[in-house]
Amino acid sequence: MQQFDLYHSGFLASAVVLEILANILLKMSDGFRKLWLGLLSLLAVLGAFSALSQAVKGIDLSVAYALWGGFGIAATIAAGWIMFNQRLSSRGWAGLVLLLIGMLVIKLA
């Protein structure tokens, strides 16, 4: 596999941003009651998977998927907190810490 370079990292970062956008739009669509927001959410998911498919051309699939999912979860938690006033329980915080530690271990491996 090629080296973890800026080009493929850019696609991975784009995939993360699009995934977060999709999650936010899905929440705002109110279960597709606001159809246009729901459709934008689906478009963002399609974009996220397209970007991820480009990222894995230069990043091992296991690493790319773990980082994509991990950063997506962490940032979606932050977005939920900031935009929708959602809070994590202490168990949720423990899970987030474990997730971040796992991502760090994968990145350093």
UniProtKB/Swiss-Prot annotation:
Subunit structure: Forms a complex with MdtJ.
Main location: membrane
Signal peptide limits: none
Membrane association type: Multi-pass membrane protein
Taxonomic lineage of the native organism: Bacteria, Pseudomonadati, Pseudomonadota, Gammaproteobacteria, Enterobacterales
Family per similarity comment: Belongs to the drug/metabolite transporter (DMT) superfamily. Small multidrug resistance (SMR) (TC 2.A.7.1) family. MdtI subfamily.
Record's protein name: Spermidine export protein MdtI
Keyword Transmembrane carried by entry: yes
